[in-house]
Regions:
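Carbohydrate-interacting regions of secretory-pathway proteins
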Residues: 1-224
Length: 224
C-alpha cells in the first residue's frame, strides 16, 4: 500500500463559520431571532398562527393556546435551544413544574422540566427521552435560570413498504453535560402506552404547551 491510496480530496467539506458566544453557525437556520414567530405556526390539524407571546426577546408559552411547530420540515439535525422555567405556583409541582417539551419530528420528545428539588419519575426528568430513557445526570441548574440544550438527532429510516429499516438515535447535551449518549429510540414518546414507530418523512419541530409559561430563546437548527 502507498500512503496516497487511503487519501482522498473530494468532495471538499463546506466551510462553516462557528458561532461566537450565543450566535449561530453560518449555515444554521434561525428558528427564533427574538423578534417574531414567522417561522412557527399552531401545531393543530389546521395550522394557523402561533399564539405564543414575545417578551423581552424570548417566546413564551401562553397556557391553553396550544403547541406550536416550525413551518419547515426537518430530518437529521443539530438543534440548539435555550429555555427558562418560571417560578412555580403552589400547584405547580412534579410534572407541572416548568413542563414543556421539544418534539423532534413532532413525535419524539426531549423533556423540558424544572428539576430543582422535583421528586417526579426519572424518565420524565429534564434531559429524558420522555418515558423511554432517563437522563444520565440531572444537569438542571436553578429555577428561573436559562438552560441550554444541544441536541444531535438521527431520524429513523423506513423502507418502501413503511417497515422500519433503522431506528432513531439521539445525543442530548444539557448545560454542557451529556445526558443522552447515542440513545436508540424504541419509537415515539406517548404519555400512555408503549412506544412504536409509524413511517414518516421529514417533519416539523414542535414545542409543547403543557400549561406553564416556559420561555425559549436562541433557537437554531442545522440540517445534517
Amino acid at each position: 500500500w502507498k500512503p496516497e491510496s487511503t487519501e482522498w480530496y473530494h468532495p471538499v467539506p463546506p466551510k462553516v463559520t462557528p458561532g461566537v458566544g450565543t450566535s449561530a453557525p453560518s449555515d444554521a437556520i434561525i428558528l427564533f431571532d427574538g423578534k417574531d414567530l414567522t417561522k412557527w405556526e399552531a401545531a393543530g390539524k389546521d395550522g394557523g398562527s402561533a399564539k405564543w407571546a414575545i417578551k423581552d426577546g424570548t417566546m413564551v408559552v401562553v397556557p391553553g393556546s396550544g403547541s406550536i411547530r416550525t413551518k419547515e420540515y426537518f430530518g437529521d439535525c443539530q438543534l440548539h435551544i435555550e429555555f427558562k422555567t418560571p417560578i412555580p405556583g403552589k400547584d405547580n409541582t412534579l410534572q407541572m413544574k416548568g413542563n414543556s417539551g421539544i418534539m423532534l419530528q413532532s413525535r419524539y420528545e426531549v423533556q423540558v422540566l424544572d428539576c430543582e428539588d422535583n421528586p417526579t419519575y426519572v424518565n420524565g426528568w429534564v434531559g429524558s427521552v420522555y418515558k423511554q430513557s432517563a437522563p444520565l445526570a440531572n444537569a438542571f441548574t436553578k429555577t428561573n435560570e436559562w438552560q441550554v440544550y444541544d441536541i444531535y438527532w438521527k431520524a429513523p429510516r423506513f423502507g418502501t413498504n413503511d417497515e422500519l429499516e433503522s431506528p432513531a438515535m439521539i445525543t442530548v447535551v444539557l448545560n454542557g453535560i451529556v445526558v443522552q449518549n447515542n440513545y436508540v429510540l424504541k419509537g415515539n414518546t406517548p404519555y400512555t402506552g408503549l412506544p412504536k414507530y409509524v413511517a414518516h418523512g421529514r417533519m416539523p419541530l414542535s414545542l409543547q404547551d403543557h400549561g406553564v409559561e416556559v420561555a425559549f430563546r436562541n433557537i437554531w437548527i442545522r440540517d445534517l
